[in-house]
Amino acid sequence: MTISLARYNFFISLELLKTLVAKGVKYFVLCPGSRSGPLALAAASLSKRKELTLITSIDERSAAFLALGISAASGQVSCVITTSGSAVANLLPAAVEADRSCHPLLFLTADRPLRLKECGANQAVNQQDFLKSVCRHFDESPKEGIHLISKERLTSLVGKSFEMASNIPGPVHINLAYEEPLHPCEIDQNKVLDGWGIEGFLKEKVTPNKVEVFKSFQSLKLPKLDPFSLGIIILGPWRGKVKQLNSFRGALKQWQKLTGWPILADPLSGVENDQEGLINHWDLFFSIGLFEKIKEIQVLRLGPIPPSRELQTWLKKPGKFQLLITEGDCRNLDPIGGSTQFSEGFSCWVDKMLECIPVKPAIDKKIVSQKLTKELIKYDLFINHWLDKRLFRNGLITEPALARLLPRLLPDSIPVMIASSSPIRDWLSYSGEGAFLRRCFGFRGASGIDGTLSMGMGLSIIMGRMVLVTGDLALLHDTNGWLFSKDKNISLIVIMIDNGGGGIFNQLNIDRIKEGDFEEIFLMPQQVCHLTLAKAYGLKYKQVACLDDLEKAIEWSFSLSTNVLIRVCTNSIEDHRLRVNLSDDLKKTLSENLSSFD
């Protein structure tokens, strides 16, 4: 009796997914398609048996960002399954972000067999090349069809791919060719599910392998800093593994206690509010020139550089001895080009430094770095009170006021995702200690607006009730993310800043346009009512007109367990003027009230 090729396809697909599950992959996001039918049937079978969690999505781009959010929050590999053709191209935006942000993500894409390639066959494209430039690793089944794969090759393919996605976290692409017939009949499905197998495929349960970190670090001399001389610590977005964050925080506390150095941290750095030496409003310090008197200083940079232009300008000036430490990422992460890079992780570096630091009197650091830190904290406290008076005095909602007030209205345990463009910049400048009261997430790899809502949904699957702060265009760009609201495990409060388009462009130094309309070619406001759109998706929503309304809306949103939308209307032109005035007035106020440090 001839066994249908469809049965072989289904069996191999089931074995592949079982092997991934055994490795530790729990979440699978499935997109519709015919060529991927065997994978869909296999995923559904394992989901019914509670062996994996299956989420479905009609939009591959949205699906990939949902999986990205799951990976970002859990630190574990999540998987996206798609059919062939342009479906694979839609994975690229999330793959780019996963690569730059170091999140483990696995793409399983079904493909046409070799006989249908390069001959004009429908939906037969060079999809195997679509994601290669940003993936940690690429692998594929036999080009003639996955039914020809051996047990040893399947085990190797899955093992290597999982390892490459996990070690230095990032995206991995596995392309799987399927020969027809694709869809097994009910008899073939039952046979496979009842234990039928291909000769050579072992039946014992696959055991997860312990993933060892692959180190390609060169044996270079340990780059050192003098803890008893003037220094400063600059933290960019966290790019290490989730499970390494606590040891990173411990090493930071240890190094700061030893040195007394001040800490300038990005909201996405993972630093906690109880960290000694933390300067909350450091971005404003640079905008008003408070650091200009510091000519020579050691700079310990942890991770990618924060987006502050003023900070980057300051770092480019002479007198900065810079050491950049990354969490296993050996790629060049220094756009300034003035640092020595150490890629074995901050905890490792601190341990090695402590072994070779000579004991010196504590008075040294008090004279040098602690003086600087105390001065910065003094300025920080002054700015903190000054901003409260300026931003809350009339009850009007502005984007800076929203960034400052919102963290105070949220429970400390509630995570926040902050969208790119104006929201993350205002959070950096105006949120103060609120930026470090909770874990913050965002796109700081490629800094795009692709998939903002979908990633927030994915984060919520792992983190539970949480908040997304986004602009109107970023939300509109990913409205398919609302389709995930059917998932009862997602509980997202979306606070949308409606400033009539791309308000960030009002903050850029764009000269007067000779021909064309600034609003049309940059701001691009859309004639869409987000509240009507929310209603169409079955969401609950509220409109906020003043700061008092915001507090009531937040209380209302936490009384619910479903996804909700809170619309906050602002004026991007007026808010730009406010930011400029705040900087100018603060500089003048400081010169009148505080003496400058040397």
UniProtKB/Swiss-Prot annotation:
Cofactor binding annotation: Binds 1 thiamine pyrophosphate per subunit.
Species: Prochlorococcus marinus (strain NATL1A)
Family: Belongs to the TPP enzyme family. MenD subfamily.
Name of the coding gene: menD
Uppermost EC category: transferase
Function as written in the Swiss-Prot or TrEMBL entry: Catalyzes the thiamine diphosphate-dependent decarboxylation of 2-oxoglutarate and the subsequent addition of the resulting succinic semialdehyde-thiamine pyrophosphate anion to isochorismate to yield 2-succinyl-5-enolpyruvyl-6-hydroxy-3-cyclohexene-1-carboxylate (SEPHCHC).
A Gene Ontology biological process term: menaquinone biosynthetic process
Keywords of the record: Magnesium, Manganese, Metal-binding, Thiamine pyrophosphate, Transferase
Cofactors: Mg(2+); Mn(2+); thiamine diphosphate
EC number(s) reported in the record: 2.2.1.9
The keyword Lyase belongs to this UniProt entry's keyword annotation: no
Name under which the protein is recorded: 2-succinyl-5-enolpyruvyl-6-hydroxy-3-cyclohexene-1-carboxylate synthase
